Amino acid sequence: MRLTRSLALLSACTLAAASTQQPLTDSDGHPKPDPPPYEFPLKFDNPRTDCKYVSQPWIADIFKNIANDFADVFKYVAPDVTFRIMGHHPFAGAYSNPKIAYINSLHRLNNCLKDNEVDSKLWAIHGGCDSEWTIMELYFNATTKRGLPWELTSLWVSRWDEDKLLREVRTYVDAGQIMRTLWDNEIWWNSSDRVTHYDIMPGPGGLPPGINASLEVDLSEELQEL
């Protein structure tokens, strides 16, 4: 008898909790992305600008539109940068050239999204100023070409020099989200952070506008000199 009452009480509590929860899907039945945990605009825990390396406000200005204008970030990448996308997923690996990293990852991902449009926000910046190391938390939001809501969180662990150039980058992303996005929108392949990438693999969408096939030859010659 007590067990029956306990089960009835548990069922009633479960139904009451479910009735107060916000719906997890939109009107079309698509899952809703979780809201960003940070407030905008970005608040700096160290707003100083008289820094030995890079200041947090300076980083925010450079990375404010990384999803749609990665070329602006390229200007602050050292030619011999060590760039590694961590994990075990299609984008993972070591890249000796940041352009290859961009084409094989962000550009390829953009080709899976509606109108190639991505809303990117810098959630938080940690470190920097008199420390050569920084951590940037980035949030990306878009709609896939299949019409599904899409979001991705990325973490950049970066080392800068006194000339404000990126010398080392380790970036962490949601591997499951990347694999689902590519699986749903193109032919899927895999990789790991133990692989060194020397070839351009932008995916079925091809190269970014303004970059032609000669880039492959130029990059090959450049890599042979390393």
From Swiss-Prot:
Keywords on record: Glycoprotein, Isomerase, Signal
Biotechnology: Phomoidrides A and B (also known as CP-225,917 and CP-263,114) are potent inhibitors of Ras farnesyltransferase and squalene synthase. CP-225,917 and CP-263,114 inhibit Ras farnesyl transferase from rat brain with IC(50) values of 6 uM and 20 uoM, respectively. CP-225,917 inhibits squalene synthase with an IC(50) value of 43 uM and CP-263,114 with an IC(50) of 160 uM.
GO molecular-function terms, A-Z: isomerase activity
Organism listed in the record: Fungal sp. (strain ATCC 74256)
Glycosylation positions in this chain: 141, 190, 212
Name this protein carries in UniProt: Dimerizing cyclase phiC
Location of the region described as Disordered in the Swiss-Prot/TrEMBL record: 20-39
Family from the record: Belongs to the dimerizing cyclase tstC family.
Functional note: Dimerizing cyclase; part of the gene cluster that mediates the biosynthesis of the antihypercholesterolemic agents phomoidrides which are dimeric anhydrides. Within the pathway, phiC produces the bicyclo[4.3.1]deca-1,6-diene core of phomoidrides via the dimerization of the monomeric anhydrides leading to prephomoidride. The pathway begins with the highly reducing polyketide synthase phiA that catalyzes the formation of a C12-fatty acyl-ACP, starting from one acetate and 5 malonate units. The hydrolase phiM is involved in the release of the C12-fatty acyl chain from phiA.
